[in-house]
From Swiss-Prot:
Compartments reported by the entry: Cytoplasm
Ranges of Acidic residues composition bias in the record: 302-332, 401-430
Known role: May act as a negative regulator of salt tolerance.
Protein name from the UniProt record: Stress response protein nst1
Main location as per UniProt: cytoplasm
Biased composition (Low complexity): 671-695
PANTHER family in the cross-refs: LD36051P, STRESS RESPONSE PROTEIN NST1-RELATED
Length: 1125
């Protein structure tokens, strides 16, 4: 307690005034209605207190009014119902309102006039005056020894260990230190005081005394420093020492007396100053007892005792929060009487009044006591009774502290009359009484002040306890929070563990399901693999089975192919055997023919030799005869007058033909037939007849015999002996052509004739002469009636106007000196010796014959029909054994019926026959498409030169295409340029060419990638039949397939044929090679295709005069590229 007591200091006046001012600002008068009854008043009072406390809590943010906060919160107002009477006083003080020392919950007692509107005017004035005095004293009143306690601003040091004893702390812990009522607080204060030790109590008293002395010194510091004032201060201090010593003695005595009773039971009497603990702040003492005025050291009674009595009665009724009823359960009536017996006097009120105005009244009272003591001492010394007043009045210094007094102080003493009244009353009292009254007043004052000190110490202890409790509660709350957080953490951990366990269980379940699913999938996969393996095995077995079947089919197919190849090979062998036999047969036939030819040649040579000898003999005879005639003529010239006897001359050479009376058309005899009788068995007897020509066939050129000069021995013999046939190769110029020398240069040696200058026909043999001789026109078309006499062409035209196939006689231009010398037309002759190009026995062109003696005139040919009929067998045999033996091995000999059909001029009507296998050298409108000219350099055919009897070149025909002196003959062929007849082609070659062309046309017309170039043999056969000439015999399928098996070469078109068996039958495909690509379109029959000849003509290939070209012939006039002989 010793460490605690020095901290309690008295506040400075400025601090006290500031606290009081702030507390006044928070306090407000509280009007109350007049209660109807005691119980209702108490109820209303409690309700009002609770309502005000709630409002203050809401406005200031403090704890409720019934609690005492350590940091300045409100505490419940302590109310002590004191009701004591003084015999001399005449009024009762029934209640006193004590407020909280902190000043937050300050509550003023309303003036009695507020509850009594029916009071008199004098009472109202007194109340107003008392209210003014109270308000004036509030401004500067501060209790001297009560310090301001604010735990929030200045922390208190802890109390001693005695304060925290086990019994006290245990008792306080059992009770609520936060919510304490007034009765509980009183009990706690009393317990606190009794628990204090002697030293602690003495220390509290000493602290209070020092605070009072300090306050008095502060109040007197502005006073003068004279001896009187010094003595006064010394007297005051001595008086205080005596008073506090006496007060402490009384406290010790009370404490010692009550200590035993406190320990024994609840009947405890309070100390003299503890009858009513003033729970109010130092600045709030003026709020309670402001209506009492100081008595200047004397106790006086107010003028109107009844008013005061009524005022206190009203105060008891209005401000009675703690009535006797509230303590009936706590204390007995005797204990309450002893407890409240200390303050049942008017002096308590006066002592409370002395505490007003910051202890100023108390200081004044102490000064008065000191002055009286000094006056008493002076009176004792000088014996002057009234020294005190004179001494006091003679002191002229100013007031002790003018600054501390307010203007309202004058209002506390309204008139001079009241002051005179108080002085008179004090003078009436004895000095002893005044001293006793002063001491008593000091004791009461000291008790009041000490109560405040004890209350302050108690509150400090309570504050520390509450602070400790708060700390404990905070710690406990913190512990609770920690425990709660730990519990939450544990719960969270439990939840996490639970979740983790659940998750683990879920994962295990998931893993189990996955494992089960994987096992199922593995089983399903194994089952699927097993099924796949079974399927693979099945497929493998099926594949092996199919492979075996395929192999079997391939073996069967290979066997069939082998059989087919074997059959084809056997068939080919048979065919080869047949061909070999045929070839052997042909060879044998050829040998026979050669033997026959050899025999014929020998016979012919023999005949020729005989004929030559005969001709030579005749020539010699003729020469000798002519020599004789010449000699005779010369002799006659030398002797003109002499008439020589000349021999008999032969008949004239220009014989006139004898026309029979009934001329009948007779078939012209072929030149080859005229000389072939000698080769027959009966040719010896008919040799003379063979040289004779019928009168109809006598040429006009015989008239040239009369132009032989009678003189001209120097001229060369132009004609050989008639008996010797002239060979075409031994002539000086080609037969039928004039000598190559120009006119007038006959003596020059002519150049040898070129191969292409050998014409076939005489240049001047006209169509009508040929008809007279029984030969058809060289072009194969007889001249129509009325056309045998033709007019000559004008000299300006260089070519004859002859339509194709209808030759007109064209007079050559230059018919003057450049005309060829006429020569005799040859008669029938014997066969010429064979050379490199033998003429076919079927050739219709007339052969040149040597000029012979004119034969005698005979009968017309119609008279010799029987003779010719009897010789037909000889002609047939001659055709078979003669020129037929010279045919190629592959050529098929034609019969006499075919020959008769193909020979032009054999029919009476002018028929235009189609081409046949054996084409003649005579010109035809429709040459054989399969033929090829063998004699490219020899104009065998009359169509080489264009017009048959065009103008002959005087100096020999130039090379083809070169300019000559003669005019260019017109082209008589249907398609322009002269087309050579091709050599005779065998049937297999022709069929193979047709098959090649058919395959190419089918590939062009219907190309198909899927077929691979293969075509159905039936379609190929149909195409071949379309391409086959109409006069050719039909081709069978077997013949075509057999020919397709032959190998290709340059003659049959080349390439190879592939034959395979398909679903629809056999298929054929042509595969060309280098030979087939170079030969080109050998068998092309369509003009305009690649390889076909370019049509050219000097005149339109239309019909001539009244004759057109047959439409079908246009597709037949072509030729393929030649392949040589």
């Amino acid at each position: 307690m010793s460490s605690h007591v020095p901290a309690v200091t008295a506040p400075t006046p400025s601090t006290v005034s500031e606290n009081s001012a702030s507390k006044d600002s928070h306090s407000s008068p509280m009007p109350e209605s007049k209660p109807v009854s005691v119980n209702r008043k108490k109820q209303k009072r409690r309700e009002k207190a609770a309502r005000l406390a709630a409002q203050r809590q809401a406005a200031n943010g403090h704890a409720p009014s019934d609690t005492l906060d350590v940091n300045g919160s409100s505490s419940t107002v302590l109310d002590n119902d004191v009701s004591h009477e003084q015999s001399g006083g005449g009024y009762d003080d029934k209640s006193e309102k004590v407020l909280n020392g902190h000043g937050h919950n300050t509550q003023e007692l309303p003036h009695p006039s507020e509850h009594d509107p029916q009071g008199t005017t004098s009472r109202k004035s007194k109340k107003k005056r008392g209210k003014k005095g109270r308000n004036g004293s509030q401004a500067s009143s501060t209790p001297m020894s009560t310090p301001s306690i604010s735990l929030s601003n200045a922390p208190r040091p802890p109390l001693s260990s005695h304060f925290g004893s086990q019994s006290s702390s245990k008792l306080l812990k059992e009770r609520s230190i936060w919510n304490t009522s007034t009765q509980e607080e009183r009990e706690n204060i009393k317990t606190f005081w009794l628990e204090l030790g002697e030293e602690e109590r003495r220390q509290l008293v000493k602290v209070e005394k020092d605070a009072v002395l300090k306050k008095m010194k502060e109040q007197q510091k502005h006073s003068c420093s004279c001896t009187v004032c010094g003595r006064k201060r010394t007297a005051i201090e001595e008086e205080l020492e005596v008073l506090y010593d006496a007060y402490y003695d009384e406290l010790e005595q009370y404490a010692n007396n009550t200590q035993g009773s406190f320990e024994r039971g609840p009947a405890i009497l309070p100390p003299p100053g503890l009858y009513q603990p003033p729970l109010r702040s130092p600045g709030q003492h003026t709020h309670t007892h402001g209506q009492f005025h100081p008595s200047r050291g004397r106790i006086h009674e107010p003028e109107d005792d009844e008013d005061l009595e009524e005022d206190y009665d009203e105060d008891e009724e209005d401000d009675e929060p703690y009535s006797d009823e509230e303590y009936e359960d706590d204390e007995g009536s005797a204990a309450r009487a002893d407890f409240f017996a200390f303050g049942n006097s008017l002096t308590v009120k006066v002592a409370d009044d002395l505490l007003k105005n910051d202890g100023k009244h108390f200081i004044d009272m102490m000064e008065q006591l000191a002055e009286r003591r000094m006056q008493r001492e002076e009176d004792t010394q000088y014996g002057i009774a009234a020294a005190h007043q004179s001494l006091h009045s003679s002191h002229n210094h100013g007031p002790l502290d003018d600054e501390d007094y307010d203007d309202e102080e004058d209002e506390d003493y309204d008139s001079q009359e009241e002051e005179e009244y108080e002085e008179d009353e004090m003078d009436a009292m004895t000095e002893e009484q005044r001293m006793e009254e002063g001491r008593r007043m000091f004791q009461i004052f000291a008790a009041r002040m000490f109560e405040q000190r004890v209350l302050t110490a108690y509150r400090e202890k309570v504050a520390e306890q509450r602070q400790q409790k708060l700390i404990e509660e905070l710690l406990e709350e913190e512990n609770l929070n920690e425990q709660r957080n730990a519990k939450k953490a544990r719960e969270a951990q439990k939840r996490k563990d639970k979740k983790r366990l659940a998750k683990l269980a879920k994962d295990e379940e998931k893993a189990r399901r996955e494992a089960q699913k994987a096992a199922e999938e593995a089983a399903a996969k194994a089952e699927q693999e097993r099924k796949l393996e079974e399927q693979r095995k099945k497929k493998e077995e099926q594949r092996k089975k199919r492979e075996a079947e395929r192999k079997a089919q391939e073996e069967e197919r290979a066997r069939k192919e082998a059989e087919k190849h074997k059959r084809l090979r056997e068939e080919r062998e048979r065919q080869e055997e047949a061909e070999r036999r045929q070839r052997e047969q042909k060879e044998q036939e050829k040998k026979r023919r050669e033997e026959a030819k050899r025999k014929e040649r020998e016979e012919r040579e023999l005949r020729e030799q005989k004929a030559k000898q005969e001709r030579e003999r005749k020539a010699q005879d003729e020469q000798s005869r002519r020599e004789r005639e010449r000699v005779a003529q010369e002799q006659a010239k030398r002797a003109p007058n002499l008439q020589p006897v000349s021999p008999v001359s032969p008949p004239p050479e220009s014989a006139t033909p004898v026309v029979s009376k009934a001329p009948t058309p007779a078939k012209g005899r072929r030149p080859s037939q005229q000389g072939s009788h000698s080769s027959s068995p009966r040719s010896q007897s008919a040799s003379a007849e063979a040289s004779q020509v019928s009168p109809r066939s006598a040429p006009l050129s015989q008239s040239s015999g009369s132009s032989i000069p009678k003189y001209g021995s120097g001229h060369p013999i132009l004609h050989p002996h008639p008996g010797a046939p002239m060979s075409p190769l031994g002539r000086t110029h080609p037969p039928g052509l004039s000598p190559s020398n120009p006119p007038g240069l006959s003596g020059l040696v002519p150049r040898p004739p070129m191969g292409h200058e050998l014409p076939t026909y005489p240049p001047h043999s006209s169509p009508y002469m040929n008809q007279l001789r029984g030969f058809p026109a060289p072009n194969g078309i007889p001249v129509l009636p009325g056309m045998n006499g033709t007019r000559p062409m004008p000299p300006g035209r260089g070519f004859p106007l002859d339509a194709p196939g209808i030759p007109f006689h064209a007079q050559p231009p230059f018919s003057g000196i450049f005309s060829p010398q006429p020569s005799g037309l040859p008669h029938g002759h014997s066969r010429q010796p064979s050379n490199s190009f033998e003429r076919s026995p079927l050739d219709t062109s007339a052969q040149p014959f040597p000029i012979s003696r004119p034969s005698p005139i005979k009968r017309p040919p119609s008279t010799q029909q029987e003779q010719r009929n009897s010789r037909r067998d000889v002609d047939d045999l001659s055709a078979q054994l003669g020129s037929s033996a010279l045919l190629d091995d592959s050529d098929v000999p034609l019969t006499s019926s075919q020959l008769s059909q193909s020979l032009p001029g054999t029919t009476p009507a002018p028929v235009m026959p189609g081409p046949a296998r054996a084409s003649f050298a005579g010109s035809s409108l429709f040459p054989d498409p399969l033929s090829v000219a063998k004699h490219a350099n020899f104009p065998v055919s009359p169509v080489i030169g264009g017009s048959t009897w065009g103008a002959q070149m005087p100096f020999g025909a130039p090379f083809p295409g070169g300019p000559t002196w003669g005019y260019t003959p017109a082209n008589n062929n249907a398609f322009g340029a002269g087309i050579h007849h091709r050599a005779h082609t065998s049937r297999p070659v022709a069929i193979r060419l047709l098959v090649i062309q058919a395959c190419k046309q089918l590939s062009t017309m219907s190309p198909s990638k899927d077929s691979g170039g293969y075509h159905d043999v039936n379609a190929v056969l149909r195409q071949v039949e379309q391409l086959r000439p109409s006069n050719e015999p039909s081709i069978s399928l077997k013949e075509m397939l057999d020919i397709c098996d032959t190998e290709g070469n340059a003659q049959n078109g080349g390439g190879t044929f592939s034959i395979k068996s398909g679903q629809t039958g056999e298929l054929v495909k042509f595969e060309p090679d280098a030979v087939s690509t170079t030969t080109g379109h050998r068998g092309s029959i369509v003009p305009g295709e690649i390889g076909s000849p370019i049509p050219s003509s000097t005149m339109p290939a239309l019909g001539g005069i009244g004759l057109g070209t047959p439409p079908s012939s246009a597709l037949r006039q072509f030729s393929s590229p030649t392949t040589g002989f």
